[in-house]
A protein has these predicted regions:
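Pyridoxal 5′-phosphate
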Residues: 1-171
Length: 171
């Protein structure tokens, strides 16, 4: 199972390119409603039913579908597809690259994680050795920037990122 939530609508891809059996996407990352998502399942993969009952979702999950959420997700996905086709995310990537260059030039010692490789256009990961994340977040907030010291799904955790550790970064 691959979490495609951040990439969906921001970079061109087709599920069959990825070589995974299942992929998850969420509407709220596209500006759609919270609480609605999609599980894309490769043809031939059998999933056991999670809730027994009616034949909704091809027998995989019984219960009334969230039609308003589905419609909101569809509208957000269509808007995201238009933005992608119109080059919006290319412009966002250019702005990210400018910010990254300026940080490297002015904030001595910062490390840009993922520089030089394909990555999401709207995400910049910067490490600043010797600075506590909480201190950076407060200072940047006071300066008018919205940053975080980790992902929203990891908020409240005090251990190092497994991904950054696997990439060779220290805690």
């Amino acid at each position: 199972v691959s979490d495609l939530t951040q990439a969906f609508g921001k970079v061109p891809f087709a599920f069959n390119w990825l070589g995974c059996d299942m992929g998850l996407v969420s509407a709220h990352k596209l500006g759609g409603p919270k609480g609605i998502g999609a599980l894309v399942v490769r043809q031939g993969i059998e999933l056991p039913s999670q809730l027994k009952g009616g034949g909704q979702e091809m027998g995989r999950r019984a219960g009334t579908e969230n039609l308003i959420g589905i419609a909101g997700f569809a509208a957000a996905a269509e808007a995201a597809a238009r933005d992608l086709a119109n080059g919006l995310w290319d412009e966002v990537a250019e702005i990210r690259n400018i910010l990254e260059s300026e940080l490297s030039a002015t904030a001595i010692g910062t490390i840009s994680v993922g520089n030089g490789v394909r990555r999401l256009p709207n995400t910049l990961c910067v490490a600043a050795p010797g600075w506590r994340g909480e201190t950076q977040v407060m200072a940047m907030d006071l300066a008018g920037f919205a940053i975080s010291a980790g992902s929203a799904c990891s908020s409240g955790k005090v251990r190092a990122s497994r991904v950054l550790t696997a990439m060779g970064f220290d805690e």
